[in-house]
Amino acid sequence: LGVPGAGQSTLLANNGLHVPFRGASDEKSDAAGCRFWYYDKGVAIDVSSDVVQDEDAFRHLCSLLQSARPKRPLDCAVLVLPTTEFIGETRLTDEKLKAVGESLYQRLQLLQQIISLIIPTYVVVSKGDMLPGFTAFCAGLTPALREQMLGWSSPYEPGQPYDASWMEQAAAAIYSTQCALQLDL
């Protein structure tokens, strides 16, 4: 899930996951507002921002997932947010960011309500190459480090209610990791 232009399709096309057969995605599914990406260990559904923004269409998609796989409709949700919404000429105002965040939160809540499961939600910040110095920073990393997550993974149980202090913990952990990596370069 993401906002228009977040780069979900680019992420799915260039993620390095093994594709068992030619043509990882089903372009025919685009007409339905989502594209299915087939990998050797799973399927990813790239939901268009039009469907995410339209509550009725999103509700219908969630219901289809629930009816197709009633015991486990999804394993997780991936929320893709571009850096361009946070920095630079195209950055959003605080009010607009809050509105976008609230809208995406409501969709994730609706999804979990319809499928009757609390699923892990991963947040990917895309378009890092738009950050000044990010490309040079990544070029200096070893191949092994480039394959690792540059971010924070919640140490809390999936069912634990969200706590606002997690954002501070995440920012501190990411900052600490970045400082350590810069010293190694």
Question: What do these predicted regions represent?
Answer:
Residues L1-L185:
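Basic, amphipathic N-terminal segments
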